[in-house]
């Protein structure tokens, strides 16, 4: 129907669509504008250049705030009406990796060194240090648990979002893990690019199954159908 062009050929970051149909696209380049709000008809609503490339998927709150995390490990809260910066916060770490919002409006941000929880007004609620969240990753939220995929065989970590304590970790064998999703029974699925493996882990951290595939799983996510079929892009 339409094509929206940015200022140069580069890597795209995460994108999402608001309730009014506005598309928010982040870009992994700091030399150009790297956050775009695009109207449903393909015209630009606004654009903005933040302090670093954006590999992490953004998150959108119910009250119209877009949260973006750059590879300078700076978390931004942007007004979706015009792209104005409501607030920003520098985090520990050399890479910004993932952002999510829960039903209470709390924001979770993961970097190469920690996972943080903030209120909508920038108050830090807790910080879990010593976790290296995979760049270009996402979080999965289920009840009071946040699931994050980690780099360098660290696998999957489950975090209690009420206090920031680590519930458990599920280590892997091959490399960086990506894109956790949770089914209605609480089973968590994620991929790992080093060993080309798909994992299913129960809510208590125990193995459900592990499947090695013969295709490249670099940056590969998954989708789960209502009838229990897991689809994986390679």
Each model region followed by its residue ranges:
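Extracytoplasmic/lumenal domain signature
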Residues: 1-234
């Amino acid at each position: 129907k339409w094509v929206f062009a940015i200022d140069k050929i580069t890597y795209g970051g995460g994108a999402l669509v608001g309730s009014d149909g506005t598309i928010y696209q982040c870009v992994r380049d700091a030399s150009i504008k790297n956050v775009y709000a695009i109207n449903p008809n393909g015209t630009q609503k606004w654009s903005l250049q933040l302090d670093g490339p954006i590999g992490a998927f953004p998150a959108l709150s119910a009250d119209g705030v877009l949260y973006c995390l750059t590879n300078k490990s700076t978390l931004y809260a942007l007004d979706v009406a015009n792209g104005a910066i409501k607030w920003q916060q520098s985090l520990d770490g050399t890479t910004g990796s993932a952002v999510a919002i829960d039903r209470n409006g709390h924001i979770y941000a993961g970097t190469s060194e920690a996972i943080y929880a903030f209120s909508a007004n920038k108050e830090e609620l807790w910080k879990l240090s010593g976790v290296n969240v995979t760049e270009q990753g996402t979080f999965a939220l289920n009840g009071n648990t946040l699931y994050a995929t980690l780099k360098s065989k660290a696998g999957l970590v489950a975090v209690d979002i009420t206090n920031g304590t680590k519930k458990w970790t599920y280590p892997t064998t091959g490399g960086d893990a990506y894109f956790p999703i949770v089914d209605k029974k609480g089973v968590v699925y994620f991929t790992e690019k080093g060993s080309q493996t798909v994992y299913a882990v129960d809510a208590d951290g125990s193995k459900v199954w592990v499947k090695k595939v013969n295709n490249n799983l670099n940056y590969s996510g998954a989708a789960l159908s209502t009838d229990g079929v897991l689809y994986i892009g390679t």
